[in-house]
């Protein structure tokens, strides 16, 4: 629901103003092993791939993935405690957190009990690669959809280059096991940025919950239990046109082709199509760069010879 109590149809809700406020304590256990402890009134637990807006493979794409609530919707959790141990190419993380999704009021803090938990394992086989597997139990995450969720994800990310000349790709699979059924999602996305120009793409297959997409034209009842996937393919491009004092402005456009299951075709048709034309404005990145692929419980600097958190000015 939005702030006026209306259902969200064909769009994502905006994120809360505060997405991460965290205190991080790191200590070296020896030359190759580190321990990290994080406490955050708002932040991300150890669950899912790097959130979509922080992935280089999705940085130019202005649209949230359809599978956001199967992979990384917990990145704004109001109450998180995470502990992590990293050694060489490996990092293991565990979290307890408030599993409830933020409400429709975007300017406040939605604190709650630390009633959910998760674990995540990272492996960096080479400088350009990072793999993760994670699982977590979310207690009553959705106000309008009572029930608990066990979420499991696996993903692989690749990044080559630096600055404004890079190529990136991410592939992921996720599953939500709910009290009333199971939903799966998969995505493949990539980006190539060179100089002032960038191109990007994303393919998704998501087993949607029809009730979340219902309009007056969609039949209620058995349709709400459909597990046929929605397919989506997006292709787009962006060009930087403004630059000054660290600010970056770009114009871009993309188009998305869909294939919908039969239960949704009365409202959406068999092959809906959408497009964006947009202007993107980025503030100065600071001395650390944009730090794409960063996460809240990042390993200590120097404890891995193969970091994926490339600085992107």
Regions found by a protein language model. Give the residues of each.
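Outer-membrane beta-barrel "beta-signal"
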Residues: 235, 269-313
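Residues that define the transmembrane beta-barrel architecture of outer-membrane proteins
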Residues: 15-21, 75-81, 86-88, 113-117, ...
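Repeated loop/turn-to-beta-strand initiation elements of outer-membrane beta-barrel proteins
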Residues: 31-35, 45, 85, 89-93, ...
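Surface-exposed coil loops of outer-membrane beta-barrel proteins
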Residues: 1-122
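Outer-membrane beta-barrel translocator/channel fold
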Residues: 1-19, 135-145, 166-188, 195-233
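Transmembrane beta-barrel strands of outer-membrane/channel proteins
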Residues: 37-41, 85, 96-98, 133-137, ...
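Residues on the lipid-exposed face of transmembrane beta-strands in outer-membrane beta-barrel proteins
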Residues: 21-27, 81-87, 94, 119-123, ...
């Amino acid at each position: 629901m939005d702030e006026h109590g209306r259902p969200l149809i064909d769009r994502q809700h905006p994120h809360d103003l505060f997405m991460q406020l965290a205190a991080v304590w790191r200590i070296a256990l020896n030359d190759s092993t580190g321990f990290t402890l994080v406490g955050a009134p708002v932040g991300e637990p150890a669950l899912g791939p790097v959130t979509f807006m922080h992935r280089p493979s999705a940085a130019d794409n202005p649209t949230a993935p359809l599978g956001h609530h199967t992979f990384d919707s917990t990145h704004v959790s109001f109450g998180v405690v995470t502990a992590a141990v990293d050694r060489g190419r490996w990092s293991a993380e565990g979290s307890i957190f408030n599993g409830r999704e933020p409400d429709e009021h975007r300017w406040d803090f939605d604190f709650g009990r630390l009633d959910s938990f998760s674990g995540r394992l990272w492996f960096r086989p080479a400088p350009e690669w990072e793999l993760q597997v994670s699982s977590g139990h979310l207690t009553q995450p959705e106000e309008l959809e009572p029930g608990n969720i066990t979420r499991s994800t696996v993903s692989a990310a690749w990044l080559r280059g630096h600055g404004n000349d890079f190529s990136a790709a991410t592939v992921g699979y996720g599953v939500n096991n709910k009290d009333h059924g199971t939903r799966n999602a998969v995505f493949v996305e990539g980006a190539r940025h060179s100089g002032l120009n960038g191109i990007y793409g994303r393919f998704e297959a998501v087993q949607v919950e029809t009730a979340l997409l219902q309009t007056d034209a969609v039949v209620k009842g058995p349709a709400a239990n459909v597990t046929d996937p929605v397919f989506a393919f997006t292709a787009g491009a962006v060009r930087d046109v403004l630059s000054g004092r660290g600010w970056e402005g770009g114009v871009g456009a993309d188009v998305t082709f869909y294939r919908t299951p039969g239960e949704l075709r009365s409202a959406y048709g068999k092959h809906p199509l959408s497009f964006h034309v947009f202007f993107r404005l980025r503030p100065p990145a600071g001395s650390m760069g944009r730090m794409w692929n960063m996460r809240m419980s990042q390993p200590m600097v120097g404890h891995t010879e193969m970091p994926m958190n490339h600085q992107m000015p």
